[in-house]
């Protein structure tokens, strides 16, 4: 999407009013102007403004006046790319990382069913689960894979070992490294404990094989066998396991993948289509890493739409097959930081695929991905909905994840979007498949909270609350409920009412996981079915493209909280299996004394290190509110006249300062003078060494706990100055914004870490200082390593002579000042 810079001349009074108003909101003047324009345009488009009564005197606006070319202003371009938001979009952003204690109580109110409806839901869910459990004891490929997953669950060491193998083997190109991994993961498993535990001959055979090969690959540690025999068995063992795991992966792959090609998948789907099921096909593959990847995925989608469209044969978007697409497959830089490229390069590809789908009248769903891509995907969706060529067509679909705290507000937004664009959107509601990575990423980035719920039962409650919202807007939303949970299915069945009509809503399930459950749903009521439609999400791809999708499915199946896993576990009663999540949350709240407490074993990101030390806070670069605040801080920091010189105290004679100040330039733009620096003379260096020696005893005598408190205070000051410190790093060191955040966080981490090292059990009598320590900073980590060296030396009781890299003196000076 191209952009144009437009301007208007303002008097000083108006400029000051803008600045003061923006500061009240912790925003920039540029953001406020764009937001005002956005809001006013929205009012005009909704016929809410009388243009005959302008509040601005027209004679004050001279549209013919050219805006003079301004001098370079640091971070102005960053500020210009902060997007104004509507009320609904702003609400979505605000809910990004809402504490669970705030989010869950609201969900409970929305998800609670009337008592008679709750009883009917439980009764139906119990009946479905009872029949399903009996079926799970049967045979067939589905039962074989289910048995293997059940026996080697992710709660066992052996299950984790298999998971590691499944996740890693296809990433390793050479056999030697693959064998080394097998040796590590298989040889330590207690496979004997699983022998004979399953009723499945297949599972027991697999266990025998793993037991045998586990011994083979560990024989180099078995003293009772000769070295020669060890070598023979080891050489034969690892390739044997590699082949065995490869076969197991292929078996599971056939369980979860409809076909290696779209034509094969369409042929394989006919059997269940004849029973009333429909399909949504997904071309397997993960995010594009190169432009060639993106073009290959685009061609794959085009060919699939053509084949699916021909197979649909005019059945339409609700009755016929459809396709699901991943936006990350269409562009290698699909992220908020590359917004303009996404809009100018990815969007045309999305539009072309959607127009092709419209030509065949098949539904096209935009798949959900990681949380940081949600809001940019909403921008793409909105633009798509207002395309004139797609007007009046209801085949556009979007996937929303119930485990995200923003989910209810996203639903409010898409309902409004459908209303404004005068169409009916297909909305697939899923629980979410990236939970592990979302939690880990928030911890790594030091964000204030998680974008997802930490307890699965909260996600179940969210799903019900969001399902109610979708069903309440039948004119604008075609709900697609993707679930394998009998209670969730039953609740939706009752929420939607008994007067079902074609096109009201549909259920969805994953190929290889949900067919036994939905065999009770799809079909005529006279045949004992529920008479509701189900669409199967059907992955298409080769064995090599299966890996990441298979891992997500294994995580879903192998998790102890998964309905698919628990249905086969006869130690879990059916009543427990189909328990109402709302009642379960209420029971937990009674026991814990508060509604919505997070998982006790998942600390918030800032508490990642427990009581030992605090995790350094980061900035979420996909959060428009955080970006606006950062923009304001960066623009303010750029107005500071930064000057640095040797810091020697007041005792050094100023007459000896002979060096002239030099300008420090932005390496990316020499028109940007970041500040000035006066370098130290030889006399100043000698004086600094003398002072460091003289003050050494005083600093060493300071109690370690007090030294630690000074470092913690410095860390807290750095946290408060994140924006200004980032600004200097970007301008002086040429850092990108994300690298600058990481740099400041690493410096803060060093301070907290070394403070924690000496805060307790550090004795000055046993840990003597070295004396004055010289810390020389590298230019590529001018704050982090600079601060880390100093923090370690100071914590241990040494005085420090700190010398920054000659390219980056300003950031070092700022750090020392703090």
Language-model features and meaning:
Residues 29-49:
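Short, basic amphipathic alpha-helical segments that act as recognition/interaction helices
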Residues 12-31, 35:
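Surface-exposed, Lys/Arg-rich phosphate-binding patches that contact polyanionic backbones
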Residues 43-60, 65:
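Short, positively charged interaction helices/loops
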Residues 1-10, 19:
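Short Lys/Arg-rich basic patches
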Residues 289, 358-360, 371-385, 392-398, ...:
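Long, K/E/R/D-enriched contiguous segments that form extended
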Residues 730, 756-818:
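Rossmann-like NAD(P) dinucleotide-binding subdomain of oxidoreductase/dehydrogenase enzymes
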Residues 528-529, 541, 545-548, 552-690, ...:
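Terminal low-complexity tails and localization/encapsulation signals of metabolic enzymes
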Residues 60-617:
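Positively charged, amphipathic and often flexible ligand-engagement surfaces
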């Amino acid at each position: 999407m191209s952009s144009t810079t437009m301007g208007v001349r303002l008097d000083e009074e108006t400029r000051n009013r803008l600045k003061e108003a923006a500061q009240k909101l912790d925003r920039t003047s540029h953001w406020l102007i764009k937001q005002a324009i956005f809001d006013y345009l929205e009012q005009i488009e909704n016929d809410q403004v009388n243009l005959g009564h302008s509040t601005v005197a027209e004679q004050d606006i001279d549209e013919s006046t050219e805006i003079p070319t301004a001098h370079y202003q640091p971070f102005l371009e960053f500020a210009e790319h902060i997007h104004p938001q509507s009320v609904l979009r702003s609400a979505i952003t605000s809910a990004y990382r809402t504490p669970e204690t705030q989010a869950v109580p609201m969900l409970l109110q929305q998800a609670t069913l009337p008592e008679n409806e709750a009883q009917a839901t439980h009764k139906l869910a119990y009946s479905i689960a009872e029949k399903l459990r009996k079926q799970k004891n049967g045979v067939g490929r589905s039962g074989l894979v289910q048995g293997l997953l059940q026996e080697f669950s992710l709660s066992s060491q052996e299950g984790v070992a298999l998971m590691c193998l499944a996740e890693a083997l296809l990433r390793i190109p050479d056999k030697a490294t693959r064998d080394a991994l097998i040796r590590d993961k298989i040889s330590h498993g207690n496979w004997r404990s699983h022998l004979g535990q399953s009723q499945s001959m297949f599972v027991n055979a697999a266990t025998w094989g793993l037991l045998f090969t586990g011994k083979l690959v560990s024989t180099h540690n078995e003293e009772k066998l000769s070295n020669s025999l060890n070598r023979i068995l080891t050489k034969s063992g690892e390739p044997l396991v590699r082949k065995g795991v490869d076969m197991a992966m292929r078996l599971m792959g056939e369980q979860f993948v409809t076909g290696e090609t779209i034509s094969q998948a369409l042929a394989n789907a006919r059997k269940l289509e004849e029973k009333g099921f429909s399909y949504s096909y997904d071309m397997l593959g993960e995010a594009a890493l190169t432009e060639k990847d993106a073009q290959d995925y685009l061609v794959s989608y085009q060919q699939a739409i053509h084949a699916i469209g021909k197979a649909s044969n005019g059945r339409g978007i609700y009755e016929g097959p459809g396709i699901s697409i991943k936006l990350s497959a269409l562009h290698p830089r699909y992220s908020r930081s590359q917004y303009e490229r996404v809009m100018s390069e990815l969007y045309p590809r999305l539009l072309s695929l959607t127009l092709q789908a419209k030509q065949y009248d098949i539904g096209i769903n935009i798949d959900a991905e990681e949380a940081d891509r949600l809001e940019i995907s909403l921008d793409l969706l909105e633009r798509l909905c207002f395309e004139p060529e797609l007007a009046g067509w209801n085949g556009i679909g979007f996937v929303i994840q119930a485990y995200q705290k923003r989910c209810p507000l996203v639903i409010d937004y898409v309902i409004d979007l459908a209303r404004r664009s005068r169409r009916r959107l297909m909305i697939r509601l899923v629980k979410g498949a990236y939970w592990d990575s979302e939690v880990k990423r928030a911890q790594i980035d030091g964000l204030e909270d998680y974008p997802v719920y930490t307890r699965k039962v909260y996600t179940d409650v969210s799903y019900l609350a969001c399902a109610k919202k979708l069903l309440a807007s039948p004119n604008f939303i075609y709900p697609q409920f993707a679930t394998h949970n009998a209670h969730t299915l039953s609740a939706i069945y009752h929420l939607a009412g008994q007067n079902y009509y074609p096109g009201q809503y549909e259920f969805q399930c994953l190929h290889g996981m949900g067919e036994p459950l939905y065999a009770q749903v799809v079909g005529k009521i006279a045949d004992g079915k529920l008479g509701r439609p189900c669409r199967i999400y059907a992955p298409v791809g080769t064995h090599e493209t299966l890996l990441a999708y298979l891992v997500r499915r294994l995580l879903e199946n192998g998790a102890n909280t998964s309905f698919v896993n628990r249905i086969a576990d006869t130690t879990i009663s059916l009543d427990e299996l189909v328990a109402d999540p709302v009642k379960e949350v209420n029971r937990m709240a009674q026991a814990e004394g508060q509604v919505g407490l997070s998982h006790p074993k998942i600390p918030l990101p800032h508490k990642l290190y427990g009581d030992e030390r605090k995790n350094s806070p980061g900035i979420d670069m996909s959060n428009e509110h955080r970006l606006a605040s950062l923009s304001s801080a960066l623009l303010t920091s750029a107005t500071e006249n930064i000057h640095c010189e040797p810091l020697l105290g007041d005792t050094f004679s100023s007459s000896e300062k002979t060096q002239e100040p030099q300008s420090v330039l932005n390496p990316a733009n020499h028109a940007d003078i970041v500040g000035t620096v006066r370098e130290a003379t030889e006399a100043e260096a000698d004086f600094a060494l003398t002072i460091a020696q003289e003050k050494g005893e005083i600093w060493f005598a300071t109690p370690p706990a007090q030294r630690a408190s000074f470092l913690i205070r410095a860390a807290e000051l750095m946290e408060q100055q994140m924006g200004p410190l980032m600004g200097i790093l970007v301008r002086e060191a040429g850092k990108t914004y994300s690298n600058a955040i990481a740099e400041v966080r690493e410096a803060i981490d060093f301070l907290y870490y070394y403070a924690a090292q000496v805060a307790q059990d550090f004795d000055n009598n046993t840990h003597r200082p070295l004396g004055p320590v010289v810390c020389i900073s590298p230019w590529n980590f001018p704050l982090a390593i600079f601060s880390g060296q100093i923090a370690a030396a100071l914590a241990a009781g040494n005085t420090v002579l700190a010398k920054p890299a000659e390219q980056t003196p300003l950031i070092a000076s700022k750090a020392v000042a703090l």
